[in-house]
Amino acid sequence: MAGVRSLRCSRGCAGGCECGDKGKCRDSSLLGKRLSEDSSRHQLLQKWASMWSSMSEDASVADMERARLEEAAAAEERPLVFLCSGCRRPLGDSLSWVASQEDTNCILLRCVSCNVSVDKEQKLSKREKENGCVLETLCCAGCSLNLGYVYRCTPKNLDYKRDLFCLSVEAIESYVLGSSEKQIVSEDKELFNLESRVEIEKSLTQMEDVLKALQMKLWEAESKLSFATCKS
């Protein structure tokens, strides 16, 4: 009929819809729309997931950096323990730190441990700009290593050094108190001091006495055997 528009469904069917069911065409259209919406939601979720993952990674990196800085700050706050480079005896710590002398390569401490022996023989300093300073030599009580000196008398311009212990950087080693990463004594270098030397010498003397006793018994046995041979 003229003037009657040809109706088409979503599949392109004309007239009364060759699909046979207008409801099915409508459902198909709605299904496509929902699939499109689901696809958009999926893309949006992926975008959010990507953004969240990126933010999580940034937060993780930030946390690691913060932890590293906190650990470094804590390490700086921990005191240093100064050891004799010869026998690893503790000599002092940074809690008694006064200053460092770059020109003489020394550190100045207010006090030291009992492992530092002070030679009471006084002598004048021969260092430049220390004219008039009276010094006493410092040695390690364990291995007798020369550690430095202590200022006993000073001119007026060096009064701040009086009674301070000056330890040579070359004669000492240090480690951070509470640090488990660094060993006080290296694996390939055993701790050797005066006490261990005395124990070793004592053991050697005992072994020597045992060897002498065995040698005497061997000599007696050889003498008896030789006498028996001659008699027969």
UniProtKB/Swiss-Prot annotation:
Cellular component terms (Gene Ontology): CENP-A recruiting complex; chromatin; chromosome, centromeric region; cytosol; nucleoplasm; nucleus
Keywords, ordered alphabetically: Cell cycle, Cell division, Centromere, Chromosome, Isopeptide bond, Metal-binding, Mitosis, Nucleus, Phosphoprotein, Ubl conjugation, Zinc
A Pfam family assignment: Yippee-Mis18
GO molecular-function term, one example from the UniProt record: protein-macromolecule adaptor activity
UniProt subcellular location: Nucleus; Chromosome; Chromosome, Centromere
Domain annotation Mis18: ranges: 79-177
Superkingdom of source: Eukaryota
GO BP annotations, alphabetical order: cell division; CENP-A containing chromatin assembly; chromosome segregation; pericentric heterochromatin organization; protein localization to chromosome, centromeric region
Annotated family: Belongs to the mis18 family.
Name of the protein this chain belongs to: Protein Mis18-alpha
Biological source species: Pan troglodytes
Name of the encoding gene: MIS18A
